[in-house]
Amino acid sequence: MSDLTDIQEDITRHEQQLVVARQKLKDAERAVEVDPDDVNKNTLQARQQTVSALEDKLADYKRRMADAVSRKKMDTKPTDPTGIEPDDHLKERSSLRYGNVLDVNAIDIEEPSGQTADWYTIGVYVIGFTIPIILKALYMLSTRGRQTVKENKGTRIRFKDDTSFEDINGIRRPKHLYVSMPTAQSTMKAEELTPGRFRTIVCGLFPTQIQVRNIMSPVMGVIGFSFFVKDWPERIREFMEKECPFIKPEIKPGTPAQEMEMLKRNKIYFMQRQDVLDKNHVADIDKLIDYAASGDPTSPDNIDSPNAPWVFACAPDRCPPTCIYVAGMAELGAFFSILQDMRNTIMASKTVGTAEEKLRKKSSFYQSYLRRTQSMGIQLDQRIILLFMLEWGKEMVDHFHLGDDMDPELRGLAQALIDQKVKEISNQEPLKI
């Protein structure tokens, strides 16, 4: 009961403070109308922030009050001696105990699932911000993503930067970039930005800016992404000139040998793939691509563009919509996701533990990437992924960062010195370095 009383007192106190704050806000608005100088404008802005903060606190206290009342009702509800809940349809008690009550009031089944995001609305919203705040938010959600998500899970956060502002009646106010940090039970609206959607849209719109600033997700760093993109134009040019095992051209008698070789190159296969993609466009994504083309974004229009692999530098969870119709781009992202799974499998294999513990350390980046990308309206060409793996797989695995950078001989020597010293000063078993 004391909890309810305390919460009610807090609600009453905050309601009184809110009445006073709203009156002060009205006074400040009148003062700005009479004399719109900097002092009055700053006062108005401070009053608006105070009212907003009090409204948020009051709403929070009211939610807590509702939760407390609900808990109290559950605690005082009489229990059935048979152990069966009054509204349970079973005539005899189940062998399972009653678990949590899942509240589905907040779920709107009319909203599309998270896989069918409104990419046009999301793209227009993001393009409306300045490049500095977009790239800083990307850094916080990729390079420092794990920490940011952990600290803000279950909330809707706002990114603020001095370069992002808007003028309202001559008053300069911050223009916040909103990103929702969902939990597993959250239902996202089609136009709502989440960390995954934000990384996807920004990576697709601004790969050149990401490349210049070398913004990279840790999961891409450990698979050797920096090494892979170092000489990308030469790397992809050599790949395109290689013979493709999946092409069997119809050769007419008397065709020159040189022309026969050209018709079997990977470049020809990619041209055929481009023809397939050109027939499978989705109207909303086309609208986004046209809108982006009229502004600052630097989306690649070909896989041999210098910035093409940087589309995946921050590990988007699907192929960005702005380059999904570029032959080989969606498959390049799938190749990177397989490399992430391969590295995690290697790490799980070398750890000590039961088979079950090792399996838990494996990942399924590829399956997730495949499912999300194909939900955008295209089927990935597994043959292109296979070509990438045959060409670069061995090289990339050799450049994985496996958390063991010490030379084996050096490690053995250091361990021997540790063992010797521990034996001199203690009878305990020396730990491994």
UniProtKB/Swiss-Prot annotation:
Q: Give the region (Interaction with host DAXX) as residue ranges.
A: 377-433
Coiled coil: which residue ranges?
4-71
**Which region ranges are annotated with the description Chaperone activity?**
1-100
Mark out the compositionally biased spans (Basic and acidic residues): 67-78
- Looking at the record, which segments are called Interaction with glycoprotein N? 80-248
| InterPro entries for this protein | Hanta_nucleocap
Q: Where is this site: Important for the endonuclease activity?
A: D88, D103
**Sequence segments annotated as region (Homomultimerization):** 1-79, 100-125, 377-425
Q: Per the record's keyword annotation, is NAD included, yes or no?
A: no
Motif YxxL: which residue numbers?
178-181
The Swiss-Prot or TrEMBL record annotates one GO molecular function as: endonuclease activity
Q: Where is this region: Disordered?
A: 67-91
UniProt-annotated stretches for the region RdRP binding: 1-50
Q: Which Pfam families does the record match to this protein?
A: Hanta_nucleocap
Residue ranges of the region described as Interaction with host RPS19: 150-175
Query: What are the record keywords, sorted?
Result: Capsid protein, Chaperone, Coiled coil, Endonuclease, Helical capsid protein, Host cytoplasm, Host Golgi apparatus, Hydrolase, Nuclease, Ribonucleoprotein, RNA-binding, Viral nucleoprotein, Virion
Q: Report the EC code(s) recorded for this entry.
A: 3.1.-.-
Viral panhandle binding: annotated span: 1-175
One GO CC term of this entry? helical viral capsid
Subcellular location field: Virion; Host cytoplasm, Host perinuclear region; Host Golgi apparatus, Host cis-Golgi network
Subunit structure as annotated in this protein's UniProt entry: Homotrimer. Homomultimer. Homomultimerizes and binds to viral genomic RNA to form the nucleocapsid. Interacts with host MAP1LC3B; this interaction participates to the protection of Gn from virus-triggered autophagy. Interacts with host SNAP29; this interaction participates to the protection of glycoprotein N from virus-triggered autophagy. Interacts (via N-terminus) with host RPS19; this interaction probably mediates the loading of the 40S ribosomal subunit on viral capped mRNA during N-mediated translation initiation. Interacts with the viral RdRp. Interacts with host SUMO1 (via N-terminus).
Q: What does this protein do?
A: Encapsidates the genome protecting it from nucleases. The encapsidated genomic RNA is termed the nucleocapsid (NC) and serves as template for transcription and replication. The nucleocapsid has a left-handed helical structure. As a trimer, specifically binds and acts as a chaperone to unwind the panhandle structure formed by the viral RNA (vRNA) termini. Involved in the transcription and replication initiation of vRNA by mediating primer annealing. Plays a role in cap snatching by sequestering capped RNAs in P bodies for use by the viral RdRp during transcription initiation.
Q: Can you say what this protein is called?
A: Nucleoprotein
- Quick one: which gene encodes this? N
